[in-house]
Every structure is written in structure tokens, then in C-alpha cells.
A protein has these predicted regions:
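Structural micro-motif
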Residues: 74-83
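C-terminal motif of bacterial Sec signal peptides marking the signal peptidase cleavage site
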Residues: 1-3
Length: 115
């Protein structure tokens, strides 16, 4: 008798991204890893952005060491890569490498002082 195939659970990162894209808020998703120096340098920038834009945008960080399956559907080739989604869920920008906080805020559709 053949063994039953193990049921694969969906990627938690993909589910998080999908949920955020359905909220009507702009979203940044960074695909990175704790083993990546630039990714580690981005951590405080993304944390500050999340705090500044709390309730107005989603900031999601996917650690590909923990959830590699999340990279596939987005064709991630470099770490870090940031993907920006408009409030309607459409992908509007993709950026490989590090980014400054003012640029992240601008890409999300806000001015630097979040007017």
C-alpha cells in the first residue's frame, strides 16, 4: 500500500502578504535573511518605518531562511528585495538591495513627514 503524501502547509509569509494586500493599505514586503548583512542593516530602517506608518501601511519582512517558499511566486533573485504594493494590492515597484527610510516612505505614497 502506498504511503499517503504529507500535506504541505502553505507558506506563512505568502499568507501574510496576501492578507495585507487585501486590507486597502499600501504594503512593503522585504525578502531577506538574517545571514545577509544588508538585510540586517535594513532591520532598524524597516522597524522605524513600521512605527512611523502604523495604521497607514503594512511593513512585512520575510526571512527566507525560515520561509524560502515565499520567494518563489515573487521571483526573488537577490536579498534583500523590497516589493511595494499599492493600496489596491497591485505590485507597483521592486527594489533590490538596501534602501533609505525616506525612499521607502515615498514609495508607499507618503511624504517624508507623512502628510
Amino acid at each position: 500500500m502506498a504511503a499517503c503524501a504529507e500535506k504541505l502547509s502553505p507558506s506563512p509569509g505568502l499568507q501574510l502578504i496576501e492578507n495585507a494586500r487585501q486590507t486597502g493599505l499600501p504594503t512593503i514586503v522585504e525578502f531577506g535573511a538574517t545571514s545577509c548583512t544588508t538585510c540586517r542593516n535594513m532591520k532598524p530602517i524597516l522597524e522605524a518605518t513600521a512605527l512611523e506608518l502604523q495604521g497607514r501601511a503594512h511593513v512585512i519582512v520575510i526571512d527566507l531562511n525560515q520561509d524560502y517558499a515565499a520567494a518563489g511566486p515573487f521571483n526573488i533573485r537577490m536579498m534583500p528585495t523590497q516589493i511595494f504594493f499599492a493600496a489596491d494590492g497591485r505590485e507597483i515597484e521592486r527594489h533590490p538591495g538596501g534602501m533609505a527610510q525616506p525612499e521607502i516612505v515615498r514609495q508607499l505614497g507618503f511624504t517624508e513627514d507623512c502628510d
